[in-house]
Amino acid sequence: MASAKEIRNKIGSVQNTQKITKAMEMVAASKMRKTQDAMESSRPYAETMRKVIGHIALGNLEYKHPYLEVREAKRVGYIIVSSDRGLCGGLNINLFKSAMTDIKGWADQGADVEMALVGAKATAFFNSYGGNVVAQVSGLGDSPTVNELIGTVGVMLKKYNEGLLDRLYLVYNQFVNTMIQEPVIDQLLPLPKSKDEEMQRNHSWDYIYEPEPKPLLDTLLVRYVESQVYQGVVENLACEQAARMVAMKSATDNAGDIINDLQLVYNKARQAAITQELSEIVSGASAV
């Protein structure tokens, strides 16, 4: 059995770690509320854009934008959004597993896969994995902006415009609630048709384009892709803070359990030492 002094040192070490994890839990909780506000503020815009684009995809426009044309999928692109920092449980690894499963499905069909990465964890994982990474960005911080993403998104859009990609997907974690974050793979291009059954059933109208659809759609469709990627980044950030808060709370609770166990061991060691001292005193007195 370890000495009482060694056990006291272990208890002190665990207590110091517990203070750190408790502080990280509180910081993550504060940041989570801020990122949730940002996520909820941008969601209506992203969802409205998705509805508008879904309606356009159902329409019969004379001008067929390349983003509306469905091509045979020989080359597939992914924009994968991860966190920059760790200590957030299995958030990133679950996302990577989901992405790898989907990538393998396309690879088995003979499609070439290219990736654009957002976040340091995705960069580290897929560079070591050996994937075909064509663009990457990290260090976005807790308040990302669309301008910081335009470069990475632009690389994939340029490839799609040049016919070097036939599909483009966005991979990110979707915030369900504080305890649940789900990996999601959304198709960005070609534009997915609306899944709204009522819209499909009653699709008897179309937008009026003034003066013509081309200049509007050329701008709108690019903005749509940028808005969806931005929403994915904001959602992933909220997921990161929630997962980190839960992970740090679990670590703090586990540290408390370890301290209680060590305290019990310490008490036993101290009791054994006292008993031994008493035995020695009694033995000495008997000898006298």
UniProtKB/Swiss-Prot annotation:
It comes from the Bacteria. InterPro entries: ATP_synth_F1_ATPase_gsu, ATP_synth_F1_gsu, ATP_synth_F1_gsu_CS. GO terms for molecular function: ATP binding; proton-transporting ATP synthase activity, rotational mechanism. It is found in: Cell inner membrane. Keywords: ATP synthesis, Cell inner membrane, Cell membrane, CF(1), Hydrogen ion transport, Ion transport, Membrane, Transport. The keyword Cell membrane applies. GO terms for cellular component: plasma membrane; proton-transporting ATP synthase complex. One of its GO terms (biological process) is proton motive force-driven plasma membrane ATP synthesis. Its main location: membrane. Pfam families: ATP-synt (PF00231). It is a peripheral membrane protein. Produces ATP from ADP in the presence of a proton gradient across the membrane. The gamma chain is believed to be important in regulating ATPase activity and the flow of protons through the CF(0) complex. Belongs to the ATPase gamma chain family. F-type ATPases have 2 components, CF(1) - the catalytic core - and CF(0) - the membrane proton channel. CF(1) has five subunits: alpha(3), beta(3), gamma(1), delta(1), epsilon(1). CF(0) has three main subunits: a, b and c. This is ATP synthase gamma chain 1.
